[in-house]
Amino acid sequence: MSILLKDVALYQNGEIHEHSNIVVDGKLIREFPKHPRNEDYDEVIDGQNMLALPGLVNTHTHVGMTLFRSYADDLALMDWLQNKIWPVEEHLNDDIVYWGSMLAFAEMIRGGTTSFCDMYMFMNACGEAAEKAGMRGNLARGLAGVSPNASSALQENIELFKKWDGAGDGRFKVMLGPHAPYTCPPEYIKKVRDIAEKYNIPIHIHLCETKGEVDNCLKEYGLTPIALMDNLGLFEQPTLAAHCVHVNDNDIKIMAQKHVCVAHNPGSNLKLASGIAPVIKMRNSGITVGLGTDSAASNNKLDMFAEMRLAALIHKANNYDPFAVTAKEAIDMGTIEGAKCLGYDNLGELESGYLADIILIDQSGFHWHPRFDSISLAAYAGNSMDVDTVMINGNLVMRDKELLTIDTERVFAEVSRVTKELYSFT
């Protein structure tokens, strides 16, 4: 099927090209004709007053935790995990995670997010919800070596890989999800490493999120979490490290040498008082840094426009440098850099031959005027409610701000039902 996105403002190569046209053929972007004829295409979408951006890439999520939104706020990370989140997680099941995930995907699509990278439990349920919604996703079974089900969870991750890697017309990839060094002892990390090497599976892990995590690791092993994982050989496989807030120069050197990608979660890190990651140092060292929301339990929304704006603002202030993260760099972190974090080299840019994950942003709002610079407006003034049309893998999943793949009324009803079930134990 061929689709023409007609007369859009096209974001390409860091510039805006007004009155452009995008032709999508199947799941790929085909061309950018100057004078297209409507009758040559199966469908034509009027892009007047629309800004075309690559679909946003959320590099670190726990979508099943969306049902924890507003349940446990204003707490430090370990208090939040140990006393609030982990006890409730004991009562999760496939049905609860499916509808929590579907709620997350409705929010993501509505806000222009087309790809997500998730680590959690009941990941088949997450995958089924993502497939129904039409999302693109990297799935990982969260692994905790200190858990009674440590071995079975690792086997679940292998089965997840066999079932979902490459599924959904190529929309899904599978990663291994060792939670963190403080939940995965060295011997368990070695098991994860060996399986990663055997099946050629990339890694998704939390690292250096808090100062306490780093201090405890130094006390127990004499190494930072980054140095410990490197010492154990985990970084021999492609690795996406979430957070990396408390990393030193040697950590950054290791990450750059081993091509470790970073999922920067500014909103979650600020809310949990974890700190501000040294993103400028990492990027200047050649490390690929994408953006993530973390879960709705710790953010509390899955809004990549908010994360792009935060990424641009906090690093300016933290470095006393107005050029620290520019509007363009913030958008690129939310698109092309995020796509690289997920293992793609044909996603995150609007170029011929690239996967057709495209969003059209309505520029008619008051906050889009006057329009001197649409790139700056997208990064600093735009918000998720501006998104009008969303395409994933060449398929329309939202048009005229209406979700096409998700029954929102049913989602709200099912979320109400499973939330009552989940919290009946508390």
How would you describe each model-predicted region?
Residues V8, I22, K27, N49, ...:
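Divalent metal-coordination and catalytic microenvironments
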Residues R69-M135, E156-A167, S416-F425:
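Alpha-helical scaffold segments that flank or form the walls of functional sites
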Residues N231-L234, P238, I280-G365, A381-N383:
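His/Asp/Glu-enriched, well-ordered alpha-helical/loop segment
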Residues A125-V245:
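Metal-coordinating catalytic core of metallo-dependent amide/deamination hydrolases
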Residues L67-W99, A106, A133-A144, K211-P238, ...:
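Active-site gating loops and adjacent loop-to-helix segments of metal-dependent hydrolytic enzymes
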Residues E209-G233, Q237-T239, C244-Q257, L270-K281, ...:
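Catalytic core of soluble alpha/beta enzymes
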Residues M1-S20, V24-D25, R30, K34-N38, ...:
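Active-site microenvironment of metallo-dependent hydrolases
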